[in-house]
Amino acid sequence: FSDLSDFDEFKLLDLRDFRNTMEAVNGVDEVYALAANMGGMGFITFHNADVMRDNALININTAEACYREGVDRVFYSSSACVYPTFMQEETEIKGLKESDAYPAFPDNEYGWEKLYSERVYQAYQKDFGLDIRIARFHNIYGPEGTFEGGREKAPAALCRKISKAKDGDTIEVWGDGKQTRSFCYIDDCLEGIYSLMRSDYDKPLNIGTDTAIVINDFVDLIADVAGKKINKKHDLTKPQGVRGRNSDNTLCERILGWKAKISLREGITKTYNWINGYKKEN
């Protein structure tokens, strides 16, 4: 943390406690509400009650505290998990538009809570004039993120597995590997958040890429970046989520003029190198 300025301050607080939330937002102009009890499919599939309870408390407290403290603007990090299951049952699907969220039928409780909390912030906007911005993230990844312990998402988990594997080894892939996803690198995501917060647009907006990849091909891409030949063993008993998910960024590009710039290969190269280097050092 040698590059921190005199204006950086860190507080480790449990935002399920309203008093802590009031302390966190006191004297703050803008709040970026990213706190959540979450993880990849392996976590959210088996922690439904924890995810719904903890995250609902965090976001209700954050909205109320921001209103009471007179925060100028609030960013809420929603998720592509809000989109209905019935629109994601095939591997080849059109990108999901913001309007597709209704009629609502998310794949899991994490998605239901995200959609509920969107409406919490919107309710505070309607009733109390809270100035809000909402982004629906589509699989954000990059260095410095969780890559082990059970909460990691697919890009980090696959990078870790391939980092540990030797050339010619076999790694476990959840599901049949035919699922499709799009992935957005963290730097692009941050640019999108900044653009949204500087805009006047106060409705939910996708932040992601519109280029989907088959998970089996994604594994091959990471292996190629690592310079290894990796075989796959598919475990059909493990959670695999919806069959296909991709982002429609038409609205985001029109409203913000924002579009992801970093290719999947470039982003995965940076992510893999960080995870691989971290494991070697530790």
Task: Give the residues covered by each predicted segment.
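Conserved Rossmann-fold NAD(P)-dependent oxidoreductase catalytic core, especially the SDR/UDP-sugar
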Residues: 33, 60-108, 133
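Helix N-cap/beta-alpha junction loops of NAD(P)-dependent oxidoreductase domains
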Residues: 38-43, 85-86, 143
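Active-site helix of classical SDR
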Residues: 109, 113
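NAD(P)H-binding glycine-rich loop region in Rossmannoid oxidoreductase-like domains
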Residues: 4, 8, 15-55, 68
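Conserved cofactor-binding/catalytic machinery of classical short-chain dehydrogenase/reductase
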Residues: 17, 30, 58-61, 73, ...
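NAD(P)-dependent short-chain dehydrogenase/reductase
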Residues: 86-95, 119-197, 210-212, 219-226
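Active-site loop/turn elements of alpha/beta-hydrolase fold enzymes
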Residues: 15, 36-37, 79, 137-140
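C-terminal substrate-binding subdomain of Rossmann-fold SDR/epimerase-dehydratase oxidoreductases
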Residues: 164-282
